[in-house]
Amino acid sequence: EVYGEKFKLNKDYLLAGALLHDVGKLIEYEKTADGKTQKSQLGKNLRHPFSGCALAVKHGLPVEVAHIIANHAKEGDGTMRSPEGVIVNKCDMLNFEGLKAFVGMI
């Protein structure tokens, strides 16, 4: 609303993409018998942006939402992101960098 007619955002796509951008992690990782988490066989071959995009398409979500999921991480760097995709990417990176600093990974 702040940018008016010059810069349109689809709030439904933005919200859906923000909520579902990491949905692929549900199948990228699995629990071991001792309760630890490890990469699944699928996760060793496909990172969560790709598996998440496939899940979105499989379940009939709009291609615009699948685009946000597919391009929210480093795999989307250098590609044309939708305005909603740019917002989700930047928020995800801010969150990731904050978590890295919090746990002392830098």
Task: Label each region the model flagged.
Residues 3-106:
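Divalent metal-dependent catalytic cores for phosphoryl transfer on phosphate-bearing substrates
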